């Protein structure tokens, strides 16, 4: 199995501002890629909630005569790029370049912002802008395919579907949404809905809020993997889902109480004609799709890492095998 290289960097989307209005929107990225055969992988040394695989930091990429396939990864609500490192690492072992971003204001890598949690559509533009960016391409020094696959977990699944043509009818927490959310915010921001009235007086938020029904489809994204899509997908315009023709693989867990599969995954599958659905059995919860924990992670947030009677690694192995086969079949 080929060594996996890993690099990180910071791009900017100069077409959009950060939430403070003090500069361009940041796109902090992480990339897993097939490294050359001589690359030396070393275990991570920095403390983390997540178990991390050994990688070859900034190693030369394994060059081939063909352009390399790219998979863009989108983390869940309040998460980080490394939250999909388990998938990125396995994709790289199979020859893919897996590029993930920390979604500004909606990531644990920086202070949470209610704007970031409310304006989920900005996440789609993050991936489009990052795919355009030159710095990660120059850092890796290879030729890449001019189209990409996209995979996302939870809010990341919402992001993936926006790029494939889903359009917003209602934000999950907007007052006019006829489908009332059973919660007022996610685990990371439980009073999120209460921030909307005051934020509507903020120019930067209002500009983004008024973009929510725009079309974020990017024709360069040719397939999508939606892992445990959250309740936010129920705010998509149904006719836009019916018009998606790109292949979509939906994966959920039978014991997901955050985004119940029968409520979210099954609903999407019925609306997206080009989709396939797999609901994993055996007590698979929402957070099973996050990385395996370290002792530090278990101590800090046991509810995220509790898996009753299952091996999280085996679930990740299965999802990664499904993803690799799916993306290879759609190239």
Predicted regions and their residues:
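Domain-level recognition of soluble alpha/beta enzyme cores
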Residues: 1-72, 93
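Short substrate-entry loop that stabilizes the transition state in hydrolases
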Residues: 39, 53-56, 60-68, 73-110, ...
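Alpha/beta-hydrolase active-site loop
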Residues: 90, 116-146, 161-162, 167, ...
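Short beta-strand immediately N-terminal to the catalytic nucleophile in serine-hydrolase-like folds
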Residues: 150-152, 251
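Gly/Ala-rich beta-loop-alpha elbow adjacent to hydrolase catalytic centers
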Residues: 152-156, 160
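Conserved alpha/beta-hydrolase "acid-adjacent" motif
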Residues: 234-236, 257-263
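Short beta-strand/loop motif that positions the catalytic acidic residue
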Residues: 244, 250-252
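Catalytic active-site module of serine/aspartate enzymes centered on a nucleophile-bearing elbow/loop
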Residues: 284-331
